[in-house]
């Protein structure tokens, strides 16, 4: 398999460079990416150390390294450009056009996107995260009715991380409820969920994927057997069908895509701004 080295550079956390860079790299199959991360590059000495690493790796591999950057310092960027690399500069790609359109120079202050602004949206996110934790796995039935959306599914379908992401990114009050073997008699909603049917959103998985996830946690158990996973998923998916519960198969879908789909299909867009 073809291998390429790729660097993610930032003068702050590096989250933006990594997220955008990864989104681009996933469009190319058959390549093993050797990833290197350098965050908080806030001095010439740190930048020089990274440049030396880039040049060393490029020489070893006989090809330029790929570099995704959100650096704002023009002097530091100029130094990186002289390294043996192909530079993808996310900020410069857009800032020049924005400057021309807005007729205003950018501030070029690192970390502005991560500054905590204590407005209504900020406080809603904090409250939503606390709600997601308090209502995890249907733990607090008394607050379930407060949810904007209730994510349902059998064990190990990814409900908890989705709810936390919905809270963190969108400020959505997301509860989750796990279907257990005790629920799986007749095809009917558990009594607790019956009055909340309109708030439900289902997660499902391919049987082989669910078995793999469960096997990692409880190897060799009945809970992790293919037959049990198949039985639970068949019951769950029929429940979704009969009660017209919107759902998404998460087998090959990222948590970001799952969450965006829930926000869109459950018509929760406006709530991400605290309204």
UniProtKB/Swiss-Prot annotation:
Disulphide bond pairs: none
Protein name: Putative phosphoenolpyruvate synthase regulatory protein
GO molecular function, one term: phosphotransferase activity, phosphate group as acceptor
Family in the record: Belongs to the pyruvate, phosphate/water dikinase regulatory protein family. PSRP subfamily.
Catalytic activity entry: [pyruvate, water dikinase] + ADP = [pyruvate, water dikinase]-phosphate + AMP + H(+); [pyruvate, water dikinase]-phosphate + phosphate + H(+) = [pyruvate, water dikinase] + diphosphate
UniProt xrefs under InterPro entries: Kinase-pyrophosphorylase, PSRP
UniProt source species: Nitrosomonas europaea (strain ATCC 19718 / CIP 103999 / KCTC 2705 / NBRC 14298)
Organism placement in taxonomy: Bacteria, Pseudomonadati, Pseudomonadota, Betaproteobacteria, Nitrosomonadales
Function of the molecule: Bifunctional serine/threonine kinase and phosphorylase involved in the regulation of the phosphoenolpyruvate synthase (PEPS) by catalyzing its phosphorylation/dephosphorylation.
Positions bound to ADP: 153-160
């Amino acid at each position: 398999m073809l291998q390429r080295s790729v660097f993610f550079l930032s003068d702050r956390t590096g989250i933006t460079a990594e997220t955008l860079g990864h989104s681009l790299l996933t469009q190319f199959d058959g390549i093993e990416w050797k990833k290197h991360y350098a965050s908080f590059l806030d001095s010439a000495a740190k930048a020089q150390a990274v440049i030396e690493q880039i040049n060393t790796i490029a020489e070893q591999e006989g090809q330029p390294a790929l570099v995704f950057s959100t650096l704002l310092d023009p002097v530091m960027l100029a130094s990186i450009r002289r390294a043996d690399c192909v530079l993808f500069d996310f900020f410069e790609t857009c800032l020049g056009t924005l400057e021309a359109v807005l007729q205003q120079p950018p501030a070029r202050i690192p970390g502005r996107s991560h500054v905590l602004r204590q407005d209504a949206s900020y406080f809603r996110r904090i409250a939503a995260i606390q709600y997601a934790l308090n209502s995890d796995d249907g733990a607090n039935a008394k607050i379930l009715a407060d949810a904007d959306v209730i994510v349902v599914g059998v064990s190990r379908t990814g409900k908890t991380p989705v709810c936390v992401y919905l809270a963190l990114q969108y400020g959505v009050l997301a509860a989750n409820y796990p279907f257990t073997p005790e629920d799986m008699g007749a095809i009917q909603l558990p009594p607790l969920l019956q009055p909340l049917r309109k708030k439900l959103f289902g997660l499902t998985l391919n049987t082989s994927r669910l078995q793999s996830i469960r096997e990692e946690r409880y190897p060799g158990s009945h809970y992790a057997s293919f037959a049990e996973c198949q039985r639970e998923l068949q019951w769950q998916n029929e429940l979704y069908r009969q009660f017209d519960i919107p759902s998404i198969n998460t087998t090959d879908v990222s948590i970001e895509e799952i969450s965006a789909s829930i926000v869109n299909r459950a018509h929760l867009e406006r709530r991400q701004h605290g309204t």
